[in-house]
Amino acid sequence: IAKLNELRSFGGAIRTRGLDDATVERFAREDRDLAVAIDAAHVLFTQLKNEMPDLLKLDEAGQIARVQADYVNFYAADAINPYVALAARGPWIVTLKGSVIYDVGGYGMLGLGHTPQAVLDALARPQAMANIMTPNLAQLRFANAIKQEIGHTRGDSPYSHLLCLNSGSEA
């Protein structure tokens, strides 16, 4: 909690409160991912104190505005999360203001949560950086894995082909 309090006390109003400290302490004892997320957030915060001290001093709404100032966001203002995510592991997000959020949804998470080690390990291997225009063995492996899962309770996949897109706002 001391690490979170350092983030919380740096300056600027907090909009997103997250879980109360007693709940955070209880879950941190039960789920190592939460403790790892808090430690990672503290390390990143320490780095940001030198790199972006003015950002850290802003109110949470000001931080959001500054972080996304140079981007077109296709979502309505009330659909944008009211915090800046600093670190995350499993279902846990630690915000730039030191709040802890439980988040099990979101684009691309595939039920694996934030920063899943299996995905990081796969991405850390050398890969041909190509899209569908360049045939690649990763495409075959992906198709085989998907076809094994989709329709497995009925004996075969109901789809003849796969179509891969980015998330809706990017497609």
State the predicted function of each range.
Residues 2-77:
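Short, compositionally biased leader-like segments
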Residues 5-31, 71-74, 92, 100-171:
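Glycine-rich loop-to-alpha-helix module at the N-terminal edge of alpha/beta enzyme cores
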Residues 80-89:
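Short loop/turn motifs at secondary-structure junctions and domain boundaries
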